[in-house]
């Protein structure tokens, strides 16, 4: 399988680094995501769910805990400060897994507009109510449904987070920015998981040294 402009999937060759089993990393390219999202009715709940997951890289529990009050529409910001769990058949909203998970993410203008359109369809939507009142199993079933419908390779909900990162790396985003966006506790965690996706900079270094001769 060809990944972006690479001749082969780098995940197949990478060795285990730290705690991350990086050789099992699965993700969609932007083209695969485009194919997937095209199979979902625009402005529907499912459409917005997967748009938020792909374009922000937030975790499944963070998505399911989102409320309208978490969005700063004037600043195009999304505040991540809670997570959702289903415990003993009860919905539980709790603090995120680590202090670093509490963060603010810049979102693209088109995503903000999609959120506004969705809320507009549900007139009087309470600011503090869960935006997507579903459980994780339902989300997983919907993912499988659209994967089958569109024919894209099957991945997990969490792999959409990996897809977001892979796209950022392809666009040249630095590891520190990705670390902050994902809410990782340190840069090493980010590099252990995604470092193999970064192209080698050795040739660029050699060219720089040549120019300094």
Give, region by region, the residue ranges found by the protein language model.
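N-terminal core-binding DNA-recognition domain of tyrosine site-specific recombinases/integrases
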Residues: 2-8, 22, 133-137, 153-159
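Conserved tyrosine-mediated DNA breakage-rejoining catalytic core shared by Y-recombinases
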Residues: 16, 32, 65-117
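C-terminal catalytic core of tyrosine-transesterase DNA break-rejoin enzymes
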Residues: 51, 55, 61-62, 145-149, ...
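DNA/chromatin major-groove-contacting recognition/catalytic segments
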Residues: 35, 41, 89-95, 192-213
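Exposed loop/turn and edge beta-strand positions of beta-sandwich/beta-sheet ligand-binding modules
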Residues: 22, 46, 74, 101, ...
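Basic, Lys/Arg- and aromatic-enriched nucleic-acid-binding interface segment
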Residues: 6-66, 73-74, 110
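Proline-centered turn/helix-capping motifs that create local helix->coil transitions or kinks
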Residues: 1-10, 73, 82, 120-125
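Active-site/catalytic core of tyrosine-dependent DNA strand-transfer enzymes
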Residues: 31, 108-153
